[in-house]
């Protein structure tokens, strides 16, 4: 029976878990990543339908890791964001709000990247790092944690000892459950359909989010005449739309999108997943910590889920690396509390904002629409407020980790 001792064992090989492994491995820590996915699926285009809007902080981190140069040619900058009311009520004028790169310190607002290209670039870097052992097609069957060490038993009989376990296996999380971490879960009774389509009319680097009564529809530009869509509806309606044949689905999508891109055609398969707000009662225990979707699932209305997870990665990596250099026990609560306290305000703020935005914008109540319309009119005329929102969305405000500033640890 094979046994191994490492500094950190990471359960879950998604983008967040893989990024953490790479940063820690490049800084001298011995890492094991346990991923239930098969390796051949990682590079199968049919396996991926998601795309991500990376903010400046996330791009800075990827640049430090020399990943940005690999994916840059596959990325698509967003120069303009249009927020638009999808339906008017009574005599209320539908609102529109426009953000352009004039409000950004850079010449873009976000960069769109398809999940497959980002994951492939990270894995290629991991494969070249001798400090990282990446175990594919592996599942944890037993998880033991005591005051001095941790032990994981895999389904192939392999045993892994480590100073710290990081749960990055999404939600619901088997690792968090085994560690005794409980989550508070609130269902929005909504589901999102995601995918990629080709279109006739160029997007001109414009992202559009249309607020419909049953949920938001986001159309996000990709390289070429292609865009990613995230279409959120009440679950019953989402199921109906998802089960349509491709022709009828595209007709309904184009109608909801107000035919802004002309003729459209599906490029990827489409996928659907339920939307919920999920937060843990705590993110750390002795020798155990959770990050990414395992620590917080938020509404996709602002497209900030991955950026929030990357901020987790940057903060945890900085805490662990600097603590290890000081000779501290990286699995101790003393060290992990630094991470927990650092991330609390940011996560709470994003959770509150996304929850509030969904309730306000996806509501057919007359008074709420009226108030929203007035608010957006005032916001559209205020450069100061727009600058504030762009600054917050950039991931560069507040007490941020060094990696998000583009600084090495």
Language model region names:
Residues 25-50:
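Glycine-rich FAD pyrophosphate-binding loop
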Residues 6-33:
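N-terminal Rossmann-like FAD-binding beta1-loop-alpha1 element of flavoenzymes
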Residues 237-326, 330-334:
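FAD/FMN-dependent oxidoreductases across multiple families
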Residues 318-409:
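C-terminal helical "tail/cap" subdomain of flavin- and related membrane-associated enzymes
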Residues 16, 39, 172:
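Conserved Rossmann-like nucleotide-cofactor binding loop
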Residues 3, 63, 75-178, 186-191:
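Conserved N-terminal helical subregion
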Residues 46-88:
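N-terminal FAD cofactor-binding segment of flavoenzymes
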Residues 62, 161-263, 267-270:
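Conserved FAD-binding catalytic core of PHBH/FMO-like flavoproteins
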